[in-house]
Amino acid sequence: MPEVIIVKDQDEAGELYARCVADLIKGKPDAVLGLATGSSPLAAYRHLAAMVKAEDIDVSKVRGFALDEYIGLPLTHPESYHSTIHRTVVEPLGLDPEKVHVPGDVLDGAPLEDGERIAHAGPEYDAAIEAAGGIDVQILGIGT
C-alpha cells in the first residue's frame, strides 16, 4: 500500500516533492521528469531549484516531458506551456532546453485544421517518452 503523507500546506508539499526529485537525480543523473504547469507545482519547482543550487546537483543529463500543450498556439507565445515550462522549470533549474519537451514540439502553432499533423502528435510524443525510458516521476496538480 502506498504511503500517505499529510502536510500543512502547498509549500511543504512542494518541498517534500522537491526532495524526492533531488534524491532521484542524485541516484539517476539522466532521470526523466514529467512536468506540469499551473500554480500547484510552482512551490516544488522553486524548492527543487534551490536544492540543485545548494547541493550542487548535476542536472545536465536530466530530461523532461510536459503533460500537455495548446493546439494552435506558437511555442514562443508567453502563455504556451512550452514557454511556461522554460520559465518555471528549465531556466531556474538550469536544465538543457534541448532535453525538455512538450507535445507541441511537433506541432508548433499548427492550426486546428491541420488534422493529419495533430493526429500524429500524440503517438510521436509517446514514442519520444518511450525512447527516453519512460517517466521516472510525474508531478501533477489538482487545481486550487
Feature names for model-found ranges:
Residues 35, 138-140:
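Redox-cofactor binding/interface segments in oxidoreductases and associated redox assembly factors
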Residues 18-26, 49, 53, 86-90, ...:
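Generic structural signal for well-ordered alpha-helical scaffold segments
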Residues 1-33, 100, 119, 124:
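N-terminal glycine-/serine-/threonine-rich phosphate-binding loop
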